[in-house]
UniProtKB/Swiss-Prot annotation:
Gene transcribed to yield this protein: Mex3b
Gene3D superfamilies from the UniProt entry: K Homology domain, type 1, Zinc/RING finger domain, C3HC4 (zinc finger)
Cross-referenced InterPro entries: KH-I_MEX3_rpt1, KH-I_MEX3_rpt2, KH_dom, KH_dom_type_1, KH_dom_type_1_sf, MEX3, Znf_RING, Znf_RING/FYVE/PHD
Description of its domains: Binds RNA through its KH domains.
GO BP annotations listed: cell-cell adhesion; establishment of localization in cell; phagocytosis; positive regulation of cell-cell adhesion; positive regulation of phagocytosis; protein localization to cell cortex
Domain called KH: residue spans: 98-159, 192-253
Feature: compositional bias, Gly residues: 13-33
Name of this chain's protein: RNA-binding protein MEX3B
Keyword terms, alphabetized: Cytoplasm, Metal-binding, Nucleus, Phosphoprotein, Repeat, RNA-binding, Zinc, Zinc-finger
Record localization: Cytoplasm; Nucleus; Cytoplasm, P-body; Cytoplasmic granule
Length: 601
């Protein structure tokens, strides 16, 4: 330092002067030079003192700069939401202890372009030379930035810019989603309504679908907004939209549940969502236009009076089958094995209002049974396999206009033969687990009644023109011309496929020629034939399950039935031989038969 330097110079000068003095014996000029040197040194010292460079001041000057760099500050930077936090932090953005403390995983947004170099938290820390603490789940979305003042200010600007950019992108994304047809939120338009659709707990996930695909599809198809119930709330879907769209959405939900569950909804008091204050729409009759039993997926028929207060799905329960249409002992189509009067009274609620044709069902425990409901304009046919058919109805052929010659005009009786009276015909169908077929029974009327025509087209004609009488389609054997062979029996043999029938409803396999009975039949024979039909159906079902052999020849397959008793235990050849006898009668019930018909299973 200058002070020590000048001290050394003074010591060296004094030593030099002493040396010069010691050698001054030879000359006397040494003292003058020493004084000049001292003056020069003193002048230099004065100059240094004027500049202020002493030892203490120099030390403080050099120590001030490091002390200024060590001054840090901390600032809190809030963002709008935790989604902004996730976007700014990025995937695995937190490092070490800080990333673990946040407690939630961050997924990147693929559509978000980088707003700045270093938008993620690690790059932002490196760029701004600051420490940024990310918020913990459950806390306020606030970043804590620590560092120098200018670095903290830069980090703050970066975080706020990233948050604003993410807000703009999210707003534009929601706008595009709304324009593309998705439902962004509950609408507030006038005329819209909100209904609640209650479903069983176990089918909520079925309605929502995988990742919400099913409920989204229903929303888009019906143009409604549907709020899905949470796990801890009641299983009620809130549907908002125009009234007709809301009804469509409810029907879509119901149809989806019925289609996926087979329509089997166990109705208990704890889980009775039909009568729980919410209109779900699983009503069998759909208001005032119910179409009778088995009409959940068929078109409603206004001619049938609905029966309120029933739980429709209880009639489709079955212990061994999960498909709609499997009739158990509790069925609308008939009673149990005994066919009690209670079942008949239940059926009377759904029978067509026509005395000419009615159908009853003989249910055998858990056997599948197909019930048919014929009306003037529609025939509702359940699905053969018991599965849900959305449109199982068909339009039969129209009735022939008056004056048109009938197919079997050659068998018309004379007008003096008596007026035609309605005949109550019953169709009982039985089924086994291996094969399902139908046995048809046509018992006659009273002793004084003349059998009417059972052809579907003529029935329609009679209902449209009640004042006209319908002639017979086929006479009994003792009245037919040419007693050698019955005309209709020959027709069955020559036309097995039924292609020459007059009406398309029969060509579809729903029926064959349905002739009347001879006028000589008595009420006793008709009652015995109808009473034996139940046992014969059961026995025939067991026989078909075992061997399916003819009960006469035990060789050919059972494909024919006798009319009117309906026993389907014979092959076509044996049935024809029975009809060709002089006094044809059924070998089982000993009832007089008129013809044999082929059965199409």
């Amino acid at each position: 330092m200058p002070s020590s330097l000048f001290a050394d110079l003074e010591r060296n000068g004094s030593g030099g002067g002493g040396g010069g003095g010691g050698g001054g014996g030879g000359g006397g000029s040494g003292g003058g030079e020493t004084l000049d040197d001292q003056r020069a040194l003193q002048l230099a010292l004065d100059q240094l003192s004027l500049l202020g460079l002493d030892s203490d001041e120099g030390a403080s000057l050099y120590d001030s700069e490091p002390r200024k760099k060590s001054v840090n500050m901390t600032e809190c930077v809030p963002v709008p939401s935790s989604e902004h936090v996730a976007e700014i932090v990025g995937r695995q953005g937190g490092s070490g202890r800080d990333g673990d403390r946040r407690g939630f995983s961050i997924s990147p947004t693929p559509s978000l372009e980088p707003w700045l170099p270093g938008c993620k938290i690690k790059a932002l820390r490196a760029k701004t030379n600051t420490y940024i603490k990310t918020p913990v789940r459950g806390e306020e979305p606030v970043f804590v930035v620590t560092g120098r003042k200018e670095d903290v200010a830069m980090a703050r600007r970066e975080i706020i810019s990233a948050a604003e950019h993410f807000s703009m992108i999210r707003a534009s994304r929601n706008k595009n989603t709304a324009l593309n047809g998705a439902v962004p939120g509950p609408p507030n338009l006038p005329g819209q309504t909100t209904i609640q659709v209650r479903v069983p707990y176990r089918v909520v996930g079925l309605v929502v679908g995988p990742k919400g695909a099913t409920i989204k599809r229903i929303q888009q198809q019906t143009h409604t907004y549907i709020v899905t119930p949470s796990r801890d709330k009641e299983p009620v879907f809130e549907v908002t939209g125009m009234p007709e769209n809301v009804d469509r959405a409810r029907e879509e939900i119901e149809a989806h549940i019925a289609l996926r569950t087979g329509g089997i909804i166990e109705l208990t008091d704890e889980n009775d969502f039909h009568a729980n204050g919410t209109d779900v729409g699983f009503d069998l009759h759909h208001g005032s236009g119910g179409s009778g039993p088995g009409s959940l997926w068929s078109k409603p028929t206004p001619s049938i009076t609905p029966t309120p207060g029933r739980k429709p799905f209880s009639s489709y329960r079955n212990d061994s089958s999960s498909s709609l249409g499997s009739a158990s002992t509790d069925s609308y189509f008939g009673g149990g094995t005994s066919g009690s009067a209670a079942a008949t009274s239940r059926l009377a609620d759904y029978s067509p209002p026509s005395p000419a044709l009615s159908f009853a069902h003989n249910g055998n425990n858990n056997n599948n049974g197909n019930g048919y409901t014929y009306t003037a304009g529609e025939a509702s046919v359940p699905s053969p396999d018991g599965g849900p058919e959305l449109q199982p109805t068909f339009d039969p052929a129209p009735a022939p206009p008056p004056g048109t010659p009938l197919l079997w005009a050659q068998f018309e009786r004379s007008p003096g033969g008596g007026s035609a009276a309605p005949v109550s015909s019953s169709c009982s169908s039985s089924a086994s687990s291996s094969a399902s077929s139908s046995s048809v029974v046509f018992p006659g009327g009273g002793a004084s009644s003349t059998p009417s025509n059972a052809n579907l087209g003529l029935l329609v004609h009679r209902r449209l023109h009640p004042g006209t009488s319908c002639p017979r389609l086929s006479p009994p054997l003792h009245m037919a011309t040419g007693a050698g062979e019955h005309h209709l029996a020959r027709r069955v043999r020559s036309d097995p496929g039924g292609g020459g029938l007059a009406y398309a409803a029969y060509a579809n396999g729903l029926g064959t020629q349905l002739p009347g009975l001879p006028s000589s039949d008595t009420s006793g024979s008709s009652s015995s034939s109808s009473s034996s039909s139940s046992s014969s159906s059961s026995s025939s079902g067991l026989r078909r399950k075992g061997s399916r052999d003819c009960s006469v020849c035990f060789e050919s397959e059972v494909i024919a039935a006798l009319v009117p008793c309906g026993h389907n235990l014979f092959c076509m050849e044996c049935a024809n031989r029975i009809c060709e006898k002089s006094e044809p009668e059924c070998p089982v019930c000993h009832t007089a038969v008129t013809q044999a018909i082929r059965i199409f299973s």
